Design a protein with these regions (language model features):
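Nucleotide-activated chemistry modules centered on ATP-dependent adenylation/adenylyltransferase
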Residues: 1-24, 29-207
Length: 207
């Protein structure tokens, strides 16, 4: 069975890939609108942990709409959720060239955790994706809380941690920040996105 996992190069999506690896042929998917080097950063992380990666182009109009929504809201939650929803549907519906063969995925997955506020996937949304696209939706970390994830990261991954705007990652936030700065100015980015740290995976620990 072949699973496509939405991948940012961070600790959560990397742990999700490792958990799925015993049961699926896992391909990581960098979902991008192409306005930054996010896909390249995701590819570097994928290579560091030994998984293949493909890219999928998202509808840039969705990203622009998400940016406008975040500016109007004054916080990023709903905009990031909107892009994640679009990414899952795009991966579920798409065909991808993996190792020279064009394939669809039997399952799609992400690195959402039990305690996440955003992005999240409700039971109804998961069932809707499964019914409409004929795939399984998997959330390997959905039963893991923050401390459990931190313990697994400490035991398994080599990561870099730093302020979100300084870490080279392949996630939606980096591209949404860039679009927002272009359309609304750096002041809007500072107002919408709270200061927080993120991680970038650079390798696996020896076990």
């Amino acid at each position: 069975m072949h699973a496509g996992l939405c991948y940012s190069g961070g600790k959560d999506s990397t742990l999700a890939a490792l958990l799925l690896d015993s049961f699926y042929d896992v391909t990581l998917v960098a979902a991008t609108v192409g306005v930054t080097d996010a896909a390249d950063h995701a590819r570097e992380a994928a290579e560091a942990v030994g998984f293949p990666l493909v890219t999928v182009e998202l509808d840039e109009a969705v990203a622009h709409e998400a940016v406008d929504r975040m500016v109007a809201d004054g916080y990023p939650r709903n905009g990031i959720q909107q892009v994640h929803d679009h990414a899952l549907e795009t991966v579920a519906a798409g065909e991808f060239e993996v190792a020279g063969t064009v394939e669809t995925f039997d399952a799609i997955a992400d690195g959402t955790r039990r305690d996440d506020r955003v992005p999240t996937v409700s039971r109804a949304q998961a069932q809707s994706i499964e019914d409409r696209y004929g795939v399984d939706y998997l959330a390997p970390l959905s039963g893991f809380g923050r401390s459990a994830v931190d313990d697994l990261v400490e035991a398994t991954l080599v990561v870099e941690t730093g302020p979100s705007e300084e870490i080279d990652k392949g996630d939606y936030e980096a591209e949404l920040r860039a679009l927002m700065a272009e359309e609304h100015g750096e002041e809007a980015v500072d107002e919408v996105f709270p200061d927080h740290d993120q991680t970038r995976v650079v390798g696996l620990r020896d076990r």
